Swiss-Prot record:
Keyword vocabulary terms for this entry: ATP-binding, Ligase, Magnesium, Metal-binding, NAD, Nucleotide-binding
List of residues binding deamido-NAD(+): R139, K172, D179, H259, K260
Name of this protein: NH(3)-dependent NAD(+) synthetase
Top-level taxonomic group: Bacteria
Pathway: Cofactor biosynthesis; NAD(+) biosynthesis; NAD(+) from deamido-NAD(+) (ammonia route): step 1/1
Length: 275
């Protein structure tokens, strides 16, 4: 293992193997402890895309909320459907919701807000690329979730896991923004393992992962966008040796996107990068 890989593995907290029962219990306890330590929390809010990460996070959140209710805490889980117009895989969102069985579900179409934002910027002389418009979608989705959380005295859950965090494969202050990230510490294959244990429909965790943010490249696979497979990313996070080209790609993503894993820099934090 290279020196940088050792640093990354320690930072990303991925275990070489997990016990499904123990991991699920640990994540539920984390969610419950956070809620119990903040008396204002009445809701947990999460956008559901129909993909592996939001399905897993949503299911664990609902299970934690169910236990909190049994313990006398008044709270609920709110799932949010956030299509941009008509979502191609809308049926998978419905399948995920049926599996999660959330207390409450809202639907907010982000298309009018995103299109208006793009138009307003264009009128100001700022022409967004399709990729940049994709980031607008991610930020609008998170804005909606925080608005719902604010309106219901809640918090927003993030779906960031370690295989995503290491590459910075999320929009800064978009899907990367949240109050808590319950599934951080898992890699992609471990997330699949937990969903399989929980009895999720196979197609929800066996589908090709995609952020699906770009109009010009609908359903673009994550692995194609990243230039590396989740198999190699997962192996890297577990401290295994992987092909040199894959390792170099992962480490380039890690270094280039370090700013996404930091809070806003100040004049007191910046000097550490000049040592």
């Amino acid at each position: 293992m290279s020196r940088l890989q050792d640093v990354v593995v320690n930072e990303m907290k991925v275990k070489k193997q997990i016990d499904s029962v123990e991991e699920i219990q640990e994540i539920k306890q984390f969610i419950k402890a956070y809620v119990k330590s903040h008396s204002f929390i009445q809701t947990l809010v999460l956008g559901i895309s129909g993909g592996q990460d939001s399905t897993l996070t949503g299911k664990l959140a609902q299970l934690a909320v169910n236990e909190l209710k049994e313990e006398g805490r008044n709270c609920k889980f709110i799932a949010v459907k956030l299509p941009y117009g008509v979502q191609q895989d809308a049926h998978e969102v419905e399948d995920a919701l049926e599996f999660i069985n959330p207390d409450t579900t809202y639907t907010v179409n982000i298309k009018p807000a995103v299109d208006q934002s793009v138009q307003s910027l264009s009128e100001a002389g700022i022409k967004l690329t399709d990729f940049q418009k994709g980031n607008e979608k991610a930020r609008e989705r998170m804005k909606v979730q925080f608005s719902i959380a604010s309106n219901t005295q809640g918090i927003v859950l993030g779906t960031d896991h370690s295989a995503e965090n290491i590459t910075g494969f999320y929009t800064k202050y978009g899907d990367g923004a949240a109050d808590i990230a319950p599934i951080f510490g898992l890699n992609k294959r471990q997330g699949k393992q937990l969903l399989a244990y929980l009895g999720a429909p196979k197609h929800l965790y066996e589908k090709v992962p995609t952020a699906d943010l770009e109009d010009d490249k609908p359903q673009l696979p994550d692995e194609e966008a990243l230039g590396v497979s989740y198999h190699d990313i997962d192996d890297y996070l577990e401290g295994k040796e992987i092909p040199a080209t894959a390792r170099e790609t992962i480490e380039k993503h890690y270094v280039r996107n370090a700013h996404k894993r930091e809070l806003a820099y100040t004049r007191y934090s910046w000097p550490k990068y000049n040592k």
